[in-house]
A protein has these predicted regions:
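Active-site micro-motifs of SAM-dependent methyltransferase domains
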Residues: 27-28, 58, 138, 175
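Glycine-rich, phosphate-binding/catalytic loops in enzymes
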Residues: 4, 35-39, 67-70, 148-149, ...
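N-terminal active-site segment of His-dependent metallophosphoesterases
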Residues: 1-36
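Active-site glycine-centered loops adjacent to acidic/histidine catalytic or metal-binding residues
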Residues: 24, 54-55, 172, 188
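Acidic, His/Gly-enriched loop-helix segments that form or flank divalent-metal centers
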Residues: 79-87, 91-186, 190-196, 202-213
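Active-site neighborhood of divalent metal-dependent phosphoester bond hydrolases
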Residues: 15, 28-119, 157-159
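Residue-level signal for alpha-helix termini/capping positions
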Residues: 10-13, 44, 125
Length: 214
């Protein structure tokens, strides 16, 4: 995807480039640690980079802080993340306590990875668009949104035609093809399961897609 973005920038050079990532960098895929390592390095020279938090990063955060209270994370893709950092998951498979695994994971996550994960934002507003992982609660102004909704919301947001102050750009709920609605744009094409990754290109007068894995 980054190679395609670089090609696009050469063909259509803008004055300013901001890359916004919508979260869920870890879990389910085979190399969560590799993804975080990639995000630690500038992908596009000269571009501003905004990294948003997804609910899977939140689950990792909770697992490290309170292992026993967040064991469900392991069933939602956390096992793959543990493996990618070289954690011995035999205890997890045996149903033993989660605390030793959390302690081992904390030791094995490199400091730059921890710093990146700690720096993730829950939203970003740029021009006519509001970026977040999952969506926003209808009827609530964007500057008063609950962070939990920005990371987790589904039905109440997806089923609503509420006109927010900005167009919401989000992921979280996989769709076969990116969806464009008057109040929101969903670009989550379920890369972990489909191999399709979608990038939305926005400018003052344009909305278009760069897709890989089609």
């Amino acid at each position: 995807m980054h190679a395609r973005i670089r090609e696009d920038l050469k063909a259509f050079p803008p004055h300013l480039v901001t890359l916004v990532y919508l979260g869920d960098y870890i879990d389910r895929g085979p190399d969560s640690a590799g993804v975080i390592q990639r995000l630690c390095k500038p992908a596009i020279p000269g571009a501003e980079c905004v990294l948003l938090k997804g609910n899977h990063e939140l689950m990792l955060e909770r697992f490290l802080a309170s292992p026993e209270a967040a064991q469900s994370w392991r069933q939602l893709g956390g096992m793959e993340t543990l493996l990618s950092y070289g954690v011995d998951v035999k205890a997890a498979l045996a149903g033993d306590e989660a605390a030793p695994m959390a302690a081992e994971l904390l030791k094995k996550i490199p400091a730059p990875h921890r710093a990146l994960l700690a720096s993730l934002k829950v939203s970003e507003m740029i021009g006519d668009y509001f970026f977040c992982h999952a969506g926003a609660r209808p009827g609530v102004s964007l500057d008063r949104q609950d962070p939990a909704d920005l990371l987790w919301i589904r039905h109440e947001f997806l089923s609503s035609d509420y006109a927010f102050e900005k167009i919401i750009v989000h992921g979280h709920t996989p769709v076969e093809q990116p969806e464009f609605h008057p109040n929101r744009i969903n670009i989550d094409t379920g890369a972990y399961a489909t191999g399709r990754l979608s990038c939305l290109v926005l400018s003052s007068d344009e909305q278009r897609l760069i897709c890989v894995g089609d």
